Amino acid sequence: MVDQNPKRSNEPPVWLMFSAGGMVSGLAFPVLILILGILLPFGIISPDNIIAFSHHWFGKLVILALTIFPMWAGLHRLHHGMHDIKVHVPNGGLIFYGLAAVYSFIVLFAVIAI
């Protein structure tokens, strides 16, 4: 018989943020390293272009994605890594995911202020 009142979990939204962070880290960071670590120092790209991009609405969305999602992925890995090595933090989910949420709001307001 099917349980009519299944227990709900907070894992699906957290896994969504975790997987988005992994994808952003894997796909966008090499490009970011190329642009900021190689092309910008050698003068191939002007700093004015990067500043103009960061002031555009699409640039702000990119900055948000490049900062918020990897933080969720990192704190999710840290939370589950602590369990793997048998270090159980009381209210660990609340602490780690709460830190990620606070960081997300701080970054959101900082990027809006650009």
Curated annotation (Swiss-Prot):
Keyword Lipoprotein assigned to the entry: answer is: no
A cellular component annotation (GO) from this entry: plasma membrane
Q: Does the keyword field hold Membrane?
A: yes
Looking at the UniProt entry, the stretches that span the membrane are 25-45, 50-70, 94-114
Q: Where in the cell is it found?
A: Cell inner membrane
Q: What's its membrane topology?
A: Multi-pass membrane protein
Q: Which GO terms describe its biological process?
A: fumarate metabolic process
Which terms does the record give in the GO molecular function aspect?
succinate dehydrogenase activity
Q: Which UniProt keywords apply?
A: Cell inner membrane, Cell membrane, Membrane, Transmembrane, Transmembrane helix
> What InterPro entries would the database entry show?
Fumarate_red_D, SQR/QFR_C/D
Pfam families attached to this UniProt entry: Fumarate_red_D
SUPFAM superfamilies in UniProt:
Fumarate reductase respiratory complex transmembrane subunits (SSF81343)
Source domain of life is Bacteria
State how it assembles.
Answer: Part of an enzyme complex containing four subunits: a flavoprotein (FrdA), an iron-sulfur protein (FrdB), and two hydrophobic anchor proteins (FrdC and FrdD).
Q: What does this protein do?
A: Anchors the catalytic components of the fumarate reductase complex to the cell membrane, binds quinones.
Family, according to the entry, reads as follows: Belongs to the FrdD family.
Designated name of the protein:
Fumarate reductase subunit D
Q: Which organism is it from?
A: Mannheimia succiniciproducens (strain KCTC 0769BP / MBEL55E)
